[in-house]
Amino acid sequence: FAWGETEPKKIYSWENYKWGRDEGQFMTKYCTKDSEGKVDNKHELDKEDDAAFVNWGKDWRMPTAKEEEELLEGCVWEWTNNYDGTGVAGRVGFSKTNSNIIFLPAAGYISGEENSSLGNEGFYWSSSLFKNTMNGSYFLSFANYYIDWRGNKRYAGRSVRAVVNDH
């Protein structure tokens, strides 16, 4: 999904991004700076723009950047090339406080039509706007040699790992 969009698509680009124009130089929603678009001071996705909420129902939503940071810091992370015999590569997080385990597949990301990092990297959107530039949003990012969270272009097709919605 592109950030703030609720349907997958074949091509991911600024030209077909729902909330931007002019190659990402002007945002039409989720903008806090006059110089970068139409200001609405929204820092988190509305429910109707949350891919998890729209596709999986009211009990689910995309995590905030703070929740992704807590997940990152609250687990010991290991890379696997073959999670539980499935042949799927990704990161396994082992909770530092209980026996919970989470697996995040290295699903890559799509820019244009190509997913060149499938099996090598993972990128999981948060619901939070990137503070440094309005054309980016926060996401959890990893490969076998790093795991971190960062912000980057909203138009790219990245994964969504839903969390339970507390309503």
Can you describe what each PLM-predicted range is?
Residues 1-29, 33-167:
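C-terminal, surface-exposed recognition/capping segments
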